[in-house]
Amino acid sequence: MLMGQSVGEGSQLLLNSLFVIAALVFFAIVVQVSDNLMAIEAKRIGADKAGHHFGLVPRMHELFETKLPSYLKNERVISSKKGFDIPLEGEATKEKLEVSALRFAINPTNFRGISPIPKVLVEVGDSVKAGDPVFFDKARPELIFSAPVSGEIVEIRRGEKRAIHEIVILADKKQMYRSFDKPDLKTASREDLVTSLASSGLMTFFLQRPFNTAPDLDIIPRDIFISTFDSAPLAPDLAFALNGQDVAFQAGIDTLGKLTSGKVYLGLDGRGETDTSSVFTGVTGAEKVYFRGKHPIGNVGVQIHHVKPIAPSDKVWTINAQDVVMIGKFMLEGKVVQSRTLAITGAPLNKTGYVTLPIGVSVSDLLQSESVSENLRIISGDVLSGTQVTKDGFVGFYDDQVTVVEEGNQYELFGWLLPLDMRPSVSKTFPGTLLGGVPSAANTNNRG
């Protein structure tokens, strides 16, 4: 009798378990079908473009993710949990510095995809105006590289196999600009705009992906991407650099919109508690996407990957935010003003800040107030992707930052192993990670 009772209780328990399982499966199916139907409806009415999840229950990661600032509500936001920010000492203070520079250069080796020995149109002793052609690519004669300043050609530096490294210009005290006919953006065709921008040298500010080369003027890019912030160590604040340039930036965006068959994408900084500059947020004619995360989230290539990856047959163009302003000024004024606001950074410097100068400024002129010893390294760009230059060199064509760091001449026994000081650590094996990213003074040692 006891055995029969046990069998009956076991059967009842099994039936109850099967009932519970069936109920859970049924509930899961209902939730899944409802989620799918809500997602389809959200896509139909366009409500999914802000990147929100639509469903009966929140996803697991939504229960624990950081709450977004209020300005990001109803915006398309892409968040990345990967990456690493390297906090360094020597950030540029929000102050405009006055620097008097006389020597500038344009360097053909800064451009990928062109002949190492382009066709040079000037000689030592020639006078040029800002915007005059200096050289062009032999394979693509329509791709012209123009002078950033007016002045005298004082030197043409060559490297191995007579490859041209730098064409140096001694700038006039009063700048003279080559005059161009202003295209009418409302009536000009795409071909007219490309011809006008190419003749002025402004097409060289675009980079073509994949491979990050000088643009092919015979193709129409699928899309054009612009990152309005940089997440690299000690990177410049582009919102500060472009403060007050709303009109020129909008004119540049309008021009870019006619150069592509697709869209102009604007990558905005969504990492802060307050919105970025109105120079960027007030733009029309571009699709805005906010990005949150750690470096390299500000890299335009990372943004392309998240927004609309490049297919094998695709070609897209990218351009720096400051260069959009150059194009805008050209459309508004009919002259080429190749100037850029540089961030002067690095812990060894006595004074950091921002300076607005023509492209390709001499490093010795730029750092004339600093005592840069042999124990310091000068980098055109940031510490991760920049190029080492000497005081006799020039800032790179696409760079908007100069960084000075100590050479790693002090060697430590097992320096890569012993957690002796505060230093960044991806693996979180050093004590600096416990203090939430305390800035450290960088040097060139890899420490393993």
Where on the chain are the PLM-derived regions?
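Short coil-to-beta-strand transition motifs
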Residues: 142-150
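Short, well-structured beta-strand-loop connectors
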Residues: 122-136, 155
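Exposed loop/turn and edge beta-strand positions of beta-sandwich/beta-sheet ligand-binding modules
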Residues: 116, 147, 163
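Short, solvent-exposed loop/turn positions at domain surfaces
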Residues: 116-122, 139-142, 351
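Buried, small/hydrophobic-residue-enriched core segments of structured protein domains
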Residues: 2-52, 143, 157-448
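N-terminal, Lys/Arg-enriched amphipathic/low-complexity engagement segments
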Residues: 38-121, 291
